[in-house]
A protein has these predicted regions:
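Hydrophobic transmembrane alpha-helices and their immediate loop junctions
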Residues: 1-231
Length: 231
């Protein structure tokens, strides 16, 4: 179970642990998991090439997403804290080892008994909108700096664009406990408009195939099952 301990020191430690495990698992996923170790030198060289790229994108997209949930919830008078899930950390790392990622290291837990549907929806949409903001900033940087496609700068910026809009889309899927289910429960028009913009941007700037969309939906359903088993 996710523990109820509101020490700020504990919260910082747990979000750092979750971020590090997610970075490691995502990097392993991009390497194809442990299957890539068949060529050790190439695996290690590529791993350390990818690590800073993944660290920037994941840290901005994941940590800021969770913190925004916390800050908006606290604005409405709730108690909110990020908490890791030990089982979630293990699943995140293990799936990364096998070359696909179920990233569920933890979440911002909100403790309140008086949230309206609107407040819950606004708290929930704050995370994906943060991802959208990161996407917009880094897209502007890409257009402004125009780095060579073969450069490390291009890799850093383009991956952050990719992961930020990807996380926005995943979290807006209408599957409990993902943000999208709460936004949809609050306001269908807001949900449809937000999801439509994210969906179009994702296809325009990431080139994600339909098969990957289907896979993300499958992962969301697995996440939902895992969440229900925790409750």
């Amino acid at each position: 179970m996710i523990r109820e301990n509101f020490s700020i020191g504990t919260e910082i430690k747990e979000i750092v642990i979750a971020d590090l495990v997610l970075i490691l698992a995502f990097t392993l996923t991009l390497e194809g998991g442990i299957g890539g170790i068949s060529m050790p030198y190439s695996f290690v060289r590529r791993f350390f090439y990818l690590l800073p790229i993944v660290a920037l994108g994941v840290t901005l997209s994941f940590v800021l997403h969770e913190l925004m949930h916390k800050f908006v919830a606290e604005h409405y008078g709730a108690i909110a804290a990020f908490r890791v899930s030990t089982m979630g950390l293990l699943i995140t790392f293990a799936t990364g080892l096998f070359g696909f990622l179920l990233g569920i290291p933890g979440a911002t837990i909100i403790y309140t008994s008086y949230f309206t549907k609107k407040q819950n929806g606004i708290v929930s949409i704050a995370g994906p909108l943060t991802n959208f903001t990161i996407f917009a900033i880094f897209l502007a940087l890409l257009l402004l700096l125009r780095p060579a496609p073969s450069s490390y700068t291009y890799a850093l910026i383009s991956f952050t664009i990719f992961i930020s809009i990807l996380l926005a889309f995943f979290n807006m899927l209408p599957v409990p406990p993902l943000d999208g289910s709460k936004v949809l429960g609050w306001n269908k028009s807001v949900y449809i408009a937000t999801m439509a913009v994210i969906f179009v941007l994702m296809f325009l700037f990431t080139g994600i195939p339909i098969s990957s969309i289907v896979f993300m939906i499958f992962i969301a359903l697995l996440f939902s099952l895992f969440y229900r088993n925790l409750m």
